[in-house]
């Protein structure tokens, strides 16, 4: 069941961001970020609905209802999507940046982006996956943790929109670095404070800081690779970020089992966050030609 859910999600999120990056040039950042905000909006709206549905009708009827709703809501929008942009038009609007201008091969740059995506999402997974359990461990109860998770996702929407606007002015890599540094600061704050009010505030800040990180990889790929390759390359990098989320959630759980505390798990997330920031700094320090006027 979860395999089919994953396959279905992969057929929408990555291709949608790749398609949006092809249609927009001047406002590409905000366009991609708006498209990427859908899953965060769902993360805010669905949990209370699902909680009520499962309490009243059980999980089977809830899953069936969600499936029917998704099918009925998604199919009409798929029909309404515009056709893919002609390759010729995309090539004319392509950036003068390329992996070769960085002094590395395209495949080497892809590996670096995948490692960066994996590292940032290992760090990102610690609060997102374990905040509910963390609140239970502190004695606040899982309900408080669920509220903090909703706050993360809610402020993540603002983060994605803001990061998109920033990317249109600064570029994908600088915006990614800003998000990575701020995410590291939020993780560090989790180490310093564990009061209930503090956790609410830090969780909101974490969502506000990290929400725009993942869409920036789509922007960076579009900036440095040929439009003909954008779909497959964005898909590969997003796969690395999702693997990082899975690895980070599992790794944090293992660390908690061995240490009996989430403190070491937060430290582990900080280390992975530094790896991400180092790669992005390297990317920014490489000499690149000026962008052609769009």
Feature names for model-found ranges:
Residues 35, 39-86:
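Helix-loop-helix hairpin linking two adjacent transmembrane segments in secondary transporters
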Residues 182-194:
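C-terminal ends and interior cores of transmembrane alpha-helices
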Residues 1-11, 118, 198-211:
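Hydrophobic core of transmembrane alpha-helices in multi-pass small-molecule transporters
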